[in-house]
């Protein structure tokens, strides 16, 4: 169940990153911050 929730959260973030790229707003810093937040949340939940 927990893995399924992580999958849907990850899928949502991937879709958001794809939308950012598709709209031509290739803001690498914004993407890096979003990925860092995801990593922090995943590691916090796992521990």
From Swiss-Prot:
Pfam families listed in its UniProt record: YrzO
Listed InterPro entries: YrzO-like (IPR025417)
The protein, known as: Uncharacterized protein YrzO
Protein source organism: Bacillus subtilis (strain 168)
Record gene name: yrzO
